[in-house]
Amino acid sequence: MKKLCMLTAAALALMLLAGCSAQEEETEPLPESMDQETVLAAGEEILNQLLDGEYEAVYGEFREDIRADLTVESVQELIESETQEAGTYEGIEKADTIGSTEGEEHGIARFLCNFSEEDVAINLAFDPDMELIGLSAGVQTSGWSFSDLTGNLSGLFGG
């Protein structure tokens, strides 16, 4: 029994360390020509338009080449599909920025929004000229629960 407890503790520590290092590797700094305050302010302005149902205004904010592949309805569907069941909007719990060089260099304003039933993560990507080039939204699920942990650990030990 003592050996099983030690093995479980070691496995847990290894999973926690792997999770932390994976999260650190995923983030890049904003491009040199962009600053956090500007990216967050632009992101919050568009976030407010989305939450107010001003989808046509948000559509108009996208860079022309991106807008060519979108419709007002696609923007509306994306947001409403993620917020419809989330309840009433209560506010921003967390806001931060990251950079990315995937596709092209850009900055991302990330918002974790509190709703009465669920939290929703909304990310807005801007090119260095501060034109909107991307939007994503998704219900924020907890990355950890006791039942998930015990299920994962029981799989390690054949149980």
Located regions from the model:
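C-terminal motif of bacterial Sec signal peptides marking the signal peptidase cleavage site
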Residues: M15-G19
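Primarily extracytoplasmic ectodomains and periplasmic/lumenal surface modules that are beta-strand-rich
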Residues: Y55-E56, E131
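Short solvent-exposed beta->alpha transition segments
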Residues: E56-H106
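Repetitive helical segments and hydrophobic/amphipathic motifs
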Residues: A11-L12
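Exposed beta-sheet edge and beta->alpha loop/turn motif
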Residues: D96-G159
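Bacterial N-terminal signal peptides that target proteins for export
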Residues: M1-T8
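Short, low-complexity N-terminal intrinsically disordered segments enriched in polar/charged residues
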Residues: S21-D52
